[in-house]
Amino acid sequence: GYDVLTYDYRGVGSSRPERLRGMEASIRDWALLDMAGVVDWVGAELAPERLFFVGHSVGGQVAGLLDNGASIDGMITMSAQSGYWRLQGAEQKLVVGFHMHVTFPMLTRLFGYLPMKRAGAGEDIPKGVALEWARWCRSRHYLLDDETLPLERYQQFQAPVLAYSVGDDKWGTPRAVDAMMSAYPNLQRSHINPKEVGLDSIGHFG
């Protein structure tokens, strides 16, 4: 069997502070500090013979930014897509575009964080995370257009990557997953249709 470690990024889940307003956090912090810190901790404390990474959505998107990515022996991603709004499913493309240009930035600045729970849409998101996400989603190549990131590390990520997309995922459409995951040089792509695996629906969040 395998030892498995899960964790929450700063500002969400069990890593959320009592007061989210005023918290300093960004998606790059999630990658360069939290995710990289987990990889270092696993190496130091568990010393595994091999380290495999499973990333959903943002987890698969940003793993290529790690300065210790060479420690990862293989990665499987699920619905790790470009968030660029024009690559979303036809039913929600315009809605996502409006949210990323107007609603999310406005609400985030108003509340000091993005109040997703009030809308029944999952976790509240720290201000810096929400604004960075919205900015990337307005850009044609998503985070790959952000020259303040260490983008050269994607080409240095040599571990094999198996990237899945899902037939009924309106966020992670096949072309959105292709657009993001093509940044990894050792990529294998696969697509799952829920009916083929005995499920009625999977979507983006399972």
State where each predicted segment sits:
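Alpha/beta-hydrolase active-site loop
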Residues: 24-45
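Alpha/beta-hydrolase-fold enzymes
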Residues: 54-141
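Acidic beta-to-alpha connecting loop that harbors the catalytic carboxylate
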Residues: 167-169
